[in-house]
Amino acid sequence: MLVHYLAVSSLAHRKRLFNSKTKGFHGEIVMDWGMKNRLTRLIQRDGKALFLPVDHGYFQGPTHGLEKPEKTLKAIYQYADAIMLTRGVLRNCIDPAIEKPIILRVSGAVTVVGEDLANESVVTSIQEILRLNVSAVSMSVFAGTKYENKSLSNLAKLVDECEDYGVPVMAVTAVGKELEKREARYLALVARVSAELGARVVKTYYCKENFEKVVEGCPVPVVMAGGPKTETQKEVFDFVYDGMQKGAIGVNLGRNVWQTENPVAAIRGIRAVVHDNYTPQEALDLFNQVKAGKA
């Protein structure tokens, strides 16, 4: 049974989702073997997940810290549960013998110098997705923009194609350049709409106020995005810990890992919070120990 698929930290949310008759979780009964297999690769046996995105180049170009993706990943990928990237980086920078699950970014065709980041299209076919043998796909969802209908329609069509082949879709709540949108009311709306359209996992931003409402209003697992790099490492551990306590199953953090002074120490600290229930201070202590070569 896929008992850990919808495991969350929030007890109330867990009780609401749990199906006592089947000893599993609501939604599992309609999943085929392929879908279950892919999801169990992404979400670990403790019901938690640490995804490492290195897909930023699809709209930012050679981002600081990702000038050479293969070099960036070499030291840190082992600490992630899955890696999120584009097909170009996958083909050219990743060893085909890698056993780490891959989440393929399939939306794009916009850049930071263009008119509107919300005007994304799906840039990969289902044939390509299967050819690359990935564990899941991801695409951005822009609600509240002039491209809202296009964005949500693209998500629905992608879900239709991927469900036919047992490939889970992760919807990525996107705000573009409008960072002020990162409040609970907006995030809860996008998360719920994405789940209603068939996304199996939702990636959204953390917000200090009412984040539990974002999670409780979403019937599929929620992972937290990192957003712009924080000023201190403690801030990262603080929001990851708080978000996990409020029901998120994990994180999808990139810049707050590979743009830090010590990416290995950063991802090990984050992993300790996600999988080992470390407090922010315990994670910071581990970060400093790794940084000093003592752990």
Q: Which functions belong to the PLM regions below?
A:
Residues 24-99, 104:
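Conserved N-terminal beta1-alpha1 strand-loop-helix module at the mouth
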Residues 51, 57-83, 107-109, 118-220, ...:
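Alpha/beta enzyme core
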Residues 54, 87, 141, 206, ...:
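Short secondary-structure boundary segments
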Residues 101-106, 221-226:
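Short hydrophobic/aromatic-enriched beta-strand-loop microsegments
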Residues 249-258:
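Short acidic/histidine-rich active-site segments
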Residues 259-291:
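C-terminal helical cap(s) of enzyme catalytic domains, especially alpha/beta-barrels
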